[in-house]
UniProtKB/Swiss-Prot annotation:
Spans annotated as Disordered: 248-274
Segments carrying motif Antp-type hexapeptide: 171-176
Name the UniProt record assigns to this protein: Homeobox protein Hox-B6a
PROSITE patterns: ANTENNAPEDIA, HOMEOBOX_1, HOMEOBOX_2
MF (Gene Ontology): DNA-binding transcription factor activity, RNA polymerase II-specific; RNA polymerase II cis-regulatory region sequence-specific DNA binding
GO CC terms: nucleus
Organism: Takifugu rubripes (Japanese pufferfish)
Family per record: Belongs to the Antp homeobox family.
Chief localization: nucleus
Example of a GO biological process term: anterior/posterior pattern specification
């Protein structure tokens, strides 16, 4: 078995005068070609254009050659698809004398058509959601998250808006109050003691003098008027009522003791007079 593999498109007989001359020409021609697995050298022009070689070397033969029953590989099919237009142009222009000029435009158009067909095939296999819709969804999600971050950026831990100056200034442990709600020295759940101005205390005392229990509507009005919260108004009135009860108890106890002392004094005076 010879180590030379005959190409499927290579002609069976070579041109030459007579049978002996043809065999001698074939041997001399085959001796000039190095033995590769594909039949041609890597840079040989006949390796890339087998049909042109068949036209060039099969012009003088009278016998009709038949193609080998070997199946074409994937690379040969790709080459046939890409250079089919070039081979057709070579046969039409050159005829039996040789291959025509290389038509790069036709080959490039065929390659582009094959790439477009492959792209459309794989695109049909993918999900119906297009790339533009996916990017639009991601962009909307990013904008929504940015809006949430921007809305929370200007609020403190309790939801109250804070100034840019306060947020930029660092707060150290020695700067915090002793009884702050999140201070270093105080307990974690302890709140700071609320201080009221003289004006606020005076207005609250006036309201307590007329009404010891406030309705929800009146509490809201006082809170807006004194720049306080409803919770602060409610706590102040609770503390004030407890203080008032203690004062009443002291007054009642003192009055009862005084009345009892007066009764006892009158009885003693009556006994002395008798």
């Amino acid at each position: 078995m010879s180590s030379y593999f005959v190409n499927s498109s290579f002609p069976v007989t070579l041109p030459g005068p007579g049978g002996g001359g043809g065999q001698a020409a074939a041997e001399s021609f085959l001796g000039q070609i190095p033995l590769y697995s594909s039949g041609y050298a890597a840079d040989h022009p006949l390796r890339h254009y087998p049909t042109a070689a068949a036209v060039a070397y099969g012009a003088g033969t009278t016998g009709v050659h038949q193609d080998k029953p070997y199946t074409a590989s994937y690379y040969q099919q790709t080459a046939n698809g890409a250079y089919g237009g070039h081979r057709a142009a070579g046969v039409g222009v050159g005829g039996t004398t040789g291959a025509g000029p290389c038509d790069y435009a036709t080959a490039a158009a065929a390659a582009a058509a094959a790439a477009a067909a492959a792209t459309s095939f794989y695109r049909d296999k993918e999900h119906q959601c297009s790339l533009e819709e996916h990017q639009l969804a991601l962009g909307q999600d990013g904008l929504h998250r940015k809006a949430e971050c921007a809305g929370l950026g200007g609020k403190s831990l309790f939801g109250d808006p804070m100034d840019d100056k306060q947020s930029s200034v660092p707060i150290y442990p020695w700067m915090q109050r002793m009884n702050a709600c999140n201070g270093t020295f105080g307990s974690p759940g302890r709140r700071g003691r609320q201080t009221y101005t003289r004006y606020q205390t005076l207005e609250l005392e006036k309201e307590f003098h007329f009404n010891r229990y406030l309705t929800r509507r009146r509490r809201i009005e006082i809170a807006h008027a004194l720049c306080l919260t409803e919770r602060q108004i409610k706590i102040w009135f609770q503390n004030r009522r407890m203080k008032w009860k203690k004062e009443n108890k002291l007054i009642n106890s003192s009055s009862s003791s005084s009345s009892s002392s007066t009764v006892n004094g009158t009885e003693e005076e009556e006994k002395q007079t008798e």
